[in-house]
């Protein structure tokens, strides 16, 4: 396995920053590592930009090796928004799609709304890098229908990690 560290950020054509990539079940690339400052540690920033990304990309490596239950793809089928995960249109124009907006639709992050593979790995990354209090708050804020969808997805994620990789 290879960790490839790139000093500067990468960007999509939409202008969104790319935090990391996973390739061929073997290589994880993390971008913007020159932004790390060991003299001024910011735990929230480390979690959001690096730890979540490492777990997210590692989860891609796992499913590139052994795919997850295809029933996961059907839970939010028709609700994935592709590159539009970053914003949504209202009568007032484009609005940023925040995580709390995504929660009520049954996604753990706005980025999870882009496609089912991202949805799957975001469940892993968010669960591993956040406290139980964060998860409980997310589920409460998601409302009854959003929480039910997240729970359904997470059950598949949990079973995949336990049954496929022996990780509980």
What are these regions (language model features)?
Residues 3-168:
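Active-site-flanking segments in enzyme catalytic domains
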């Amino acid at each position: 396995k290879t960790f490839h560290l790139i000093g500067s950020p990468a960007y999509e054509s939409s202008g969104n920053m790319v935090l990391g990539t996973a390739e061929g079940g073997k290589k994880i690339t993390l971008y913007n590592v020159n932004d790390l400052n060991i003299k001024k540690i910011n735990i929230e920033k480390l979690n959001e930009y690096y730890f979540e990304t490492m777990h997210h990309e590692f989860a891609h490596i796992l499913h590139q090796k052994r795919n997850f239950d295809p029933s996961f793809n059907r839970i939010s089928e028709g609700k994935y928004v592709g590159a539009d995960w970053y914003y949504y249109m209202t009568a007032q124009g484009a609005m940023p799609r925040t995580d709390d907006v995504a929660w009520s639709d049954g996604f753990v992050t706005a980025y999870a709304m882009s496609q089912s593979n991202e949805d799957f790995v975001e469940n892993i990354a968010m669960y591993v890098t956040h406290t139980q209090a964060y998860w409980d708050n997310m589920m409460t804020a998601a409302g009854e229908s959003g929480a039910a969808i997240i729970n359904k997805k997470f059950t598949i994620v949990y079973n995949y990690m336990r049954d496929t990789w022996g990780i509980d």
